[in-house]
Amino acid sequence: MKLAGEDPSVEDLMLVENFAERENNMIRRFASVSRREFLQAGTVGIVGATSVRANGVAAVGQPERGRLDQPVASVKALVFDVFGTVVDWRTSVTREVQDLAMRKGLTVDAAKFADAWRAGYGPTMNRVRNGELPWTKLDALHRMILEKILIDFGITGLSEAETDTLNRVWHRLQPWPDAVGGLTRLKNRFIIAPLSNGNISLMTDLAKHSGLPWDCILGAELVRHYKPDREVYQSAADFLDLKVAEVMMVAAHLGDLRAAKGVGLRTALVTRPLEYGPHGTPDLKPDSSADVAAKDFNDLAERLGA
């Protein structure tokens, strides 16, 4: 595993090529499908439309729940950041690392391991964004980071199957307690979909594992750009045949909201005080990047009149 600024290693490039070959086969298969057909097809889990509804949603009056005012009166779809906003990645990864350590007789600080894995996410993803690596699925990026931190933490003796199973912990993350119920409420009034940097198979597995009631799956893989690239946010409106102002980005991270707002999406901050653990520093106070602020998805549903 090479650090940012260094040439990719042979191992990195081989891993990327294996993922890229499967990716290219899938893209060729769907190259002739229009956006609307793509959304409605529901094939191979790419964009699996179920009951998509948009009932002319009205907007949020921030001081008073349920009051629907400008500037979000035209919102018809909500798209969600997933890691940290919908699912509790830190607790989930920590528990699986603890279980693995117990089975293998390892001594490891599982919470620090989870934090280190997540800390590698941005820098490794930026190697794709800045052209150092070709387009690479998040599963492959997670594997690159994992192989490095296994060495950093002195963990050896894992089989290929054990390493692969650990890498796929990101497919098995647990939702926040309010997530499924809150999303179900919001679905009654809006189109709801993830807009994540996670690849489509990852998002599909998460939805099935946790019962996330998405209408369809959107995200970085469909446009081969990672957030905060504007192409990802624009694609949400394009795939849903909506104007950007008819789409609201929901996230626990102000940086995500700033990027979305820069493209013209409406925005909602949902705070997750424990995303980074009891001593973390999450975004808890909205700024001008947030049109709406809520303490969880049920609170957001009330504020949006769902």
Stretch-by-stretch model annotation:
Residues 1-33:
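N-terminal secretory signal peptides
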Residues 104-105, 114-164:
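A metal-dependent, Asp-based hydrolase signature
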Residues 18, 27-42, 46, 64-75, ...:
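Asp-based, Mg2+/Mn2+-dependent phosphohydrolase catalytic module
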Residues 53-63:
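Signal peptide processing junction and immediate N-terminal pro/mature segment
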